[in-house]
């Protein structure tokens, strides 16, 4: 949760200066959207401008993991992501400084290109196993990423099983993970995709088009998984334009069984939203469990 005590602006400015090699003094600071989890600010010094996320000091590992994910996606040279500048903790806060991006309005070509770029990210390789070099977060929820050989095992145990255990502690009328996990493994069966570097939290608010027309993806929960998890989430919470899917499938054609797997993959996010926010997500998650697992 964001904190109300004064932020360590001087410390942040000093670290920006040290990291970039350019003197930076905050001439202007304004509050901008940081999402449901963090506080967001724009810091300006002449032509230099940065986006800063703030949270409680104990959340510094969340920002460290986000920076690692952004750096890994950038290294593939497939899709634009915000460049992390620096991160740290001071005076009761943790912070992540990113390059400032100017968002515009996308057209058919830019959304088509975003789909192509995401497919290229998914095909970039980089790991023989599923998981990630460190645990990270999905929103504010811890996301475990132990290296795992089997995709069915990874998703069943470390995605749905983990979120279900949290949900049962919040509301006892969810099924036991000990019952659900074997069913998920059976449903995914022998699906063993090549591990893809995925964004991990790609709803419509985390994809945008810059004023230059270049597509960009934001706020990742990165790991190596099934590329379909990203595609599935783009259809949740508003969806992406049709041109995006045309572009994606021009590089990576749709595979049989995706419509069934999509429900399973998006159940992870609905469970996470219940664990974060409660409310109607409980009923939605229970309906999805019945729909895809007959539970």
Curated annotation (Swiss-Prot):
Biological function: Ketoamine kinase that phosphorylates ketoamines on the third carbon of the sugar moiety to generate ketoamine 3-phosphate.
Pfam families with a match to the protein in the record: Fructosamin_kin
Residues forming coiled coils: none
Native organism: Synechocystis sp. (strain ATCC 27184 / PCC 6803 / Kazusa)
Lineage of source species: Bacteria, Bacillati, Cyanobacteriota, Cyanophyceae, Synechococcales
GO molecular function, one term: kinase activity
rRNA-binding recorded as keyword: no
Keyword Cell wall biogenesis/degradation: no
Protein name, entry field: Probable ketoamine kinase slr1563
Family label: Belongs to the fructosamine kinase family.
Active site residues according to the UniProt entry: 201 (proton acceptor)
Disulfide bonds: none
E.C. number: 2.7.1.-
